[in-house]
Structures are given as structure tokens and as C-alpha cells.
Amino acid sequence: MKISLLDYGLVDEGKTSAEAVRETLELAQLADELGFHRFWVSEHHNVPALSISAPEVVIPYLASHTKNIHIGSGGIMGLHYSPYKVAEIMSTLEGLFPGRMDIGLGNSPGTPLVGRNLQSLYSKEQYALWLEKLQHYLNEARHKGVVVPEVATVPEQLLLGMGGQSIESAATLGLSFVYGVFPYIPQDPVELAKSLSKKYRSTFKSGPHSKPSNFVLAVFVVIADTSEEAEEMAKPLDLWMLGKQDFSEFHTFPTRKDVETYELTQRDREKIASNRSRLIVGNPREVFEQMETLRAVSNPDELLFIPLVGSIEKRKRSVELLAEL
């Protein structure tokens, strides 16, 4: 089974955002060496501890310093941008790195502040229309000089989501679908994975490039050599996932010291417990067993791991352990 990585460009204590982007390159190069299929970067705005706000700029930087791995976005938040401009960007990248570009697309409008400053042209209810326009520019209009540069192939498109409009559009347009098992989603992750994979495959219609259905399972994972170490690494993530002040409470990713000094409310503890039920935490054997539960019900074509842990050394070790599963 193909395995891939999604990196958030974490800014660790004592590091700058610029250093965090360079550490993302280190992870991409390691993933390339270890045979991972894809390496994606996220798009986040107004979140100080996450360094990547312009994945379309980071993607060619990563691709030019790696050899075989697919590089892409996980994902570009399309509602902030013109579908025509996104088509131009992706066509340009495909021309520079043919056969290695992915475009993961999300429909999150972000916070009101982000929406205002990016002057979003589309509402969340118009996401299906946005996707249809993008398909037109990447397919029908591709050989008519409407989108330049004109390229022989188009990047693979994958829609990110947790159901709803995203999975319907992915199936209807013949695109890959990435189901994110995210900590702050209330539904049972196992049951949702089962129902979404069934719905996607039963309603899938092959698109203009006749690609088969492709169901990808994306999970937050904290993996270490021992259970005890994994548990310690997960505690800063617990704090982060509280998401206070629109994830701006911490200006760098939380540390062990933050965990020790943070005063948790009862509501915080309840939220942490709820989030933990959707995280994969443990040593390699424990992580494998937890992943098997999700795989058994959804039969994914690919796995996309999100190793959201502090320190580049621990992220690298996580990647090495994931490659061995």
C-alpha cells in the first residue's frame, strides 16, 4: 500500500518560520529516500506556529530538491482563489516537474479575518461550482490556449474532506478523495471511514482521464520507539488541538514545559479526551494495530500520515518508523 506524508511546517520553540520551512525540506528529502509516495504541505493563515501559508511557493522548492516523490498541497483552500489562477499555477508546476505534482484541494473558508483579508470570491456553498470551473480550465480549456503554459498532463487532483459536498464532488468528477480523521470532528472515525469509503466507491464516475477511484485515509499519528515516549510526544499536541484563539494561543508549537505549566479546565480535559479518540498514538506495533482497525473497515488505497510532533529530530524519527510499518 502506498504511504504518504502531510507536513504542517511546525515552528518549534527557538526557531523562526524560515527555519521551519527549511526543516520541511529535510522531511521531504527523507521521505523521498525512504520511498514514500507523496509529500504534501498544508495551507494555514494567521497561525503563528505553522509556517506554510503559500504552498504553491513551497512546492517547487521541495520538488527541486527531491528526486522521485510526488509533491503537492494538502491542501490549497480553493475558495480563497480564482479557479483560473489555480489552474495556471498547477499547469506551470506540472510543466516544470511533469508527473510529480499533486493538487490537494480543501474548502475551508478559514477564520473571518482570513476571509476578509484574502477577499474570498466564493462561499462554501459554491464549492461544487468552483471545482467545476477548475475542471474546465484543466481539461476542456487546456488545449485552447486559455490556460498557459499548455502541458501534456495535468496534476493529480485529490479532494480533502470529511464527507458532504467534498465526497460527492470527488465521486461525480472522478477525482481522488482524502478522508481526514481529524481530532476535532465529533463523528466516530471508524464508522465514518466505513460509510464514506462505501459511498465514494459506489457513486464514483470515471473522469476525463479515466483514472480509477482512489480513497485515501489521512490520520494524525504520534509514533515513537516506545509507548512512553509516544505518550510524552502526544501531550503537546493535546494542548495544540484545544485550538484556542483560532490556534493562535501558542506562537510556536507547544513544548513539554508548556504542558507542565498549562492550567487545564475541566472543559479542556474533556476536549483532550475526545480528541485522543481520533489520534493514533503509540509504538510501531500499537500504531499498526490501530491503523488496522481503520483499514479493515474502509480498505483505503493509500495512507496519508500527519506526524504533528515537536522537534525536527522527532519528526524525522517518526517518518523512519512509519516507513517500517
Task: Report the location of each language-model feature.
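A conserved active-site cap/scaffold subdomain adjacent to cofactor or substrate pockets
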Residues: 167, 171-192
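Short, well-ordered coil/turn segments that N-cap beta-strands
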Residues: 1-3, 36-38, 66-71, 97-102, ...
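An alpha-helical appendage that flanks or caps ligand/catalytic pockets
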Residues: 124-146, 188-300
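N-terminal beta1-alpha1-beta2 module of alpha/beta enzyme domains
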Residues: 1-65
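Conserved, mostly hydrophobic/aromatic
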Residues: 3, 31, 35, 43, ...
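Short, acidic/polar
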Residues: 18-30, 163-168, 284-293
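Flexible, glycine-rich active-site loops centered on histidine and acidic residues
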Residues: 2-17, 79-141, 185
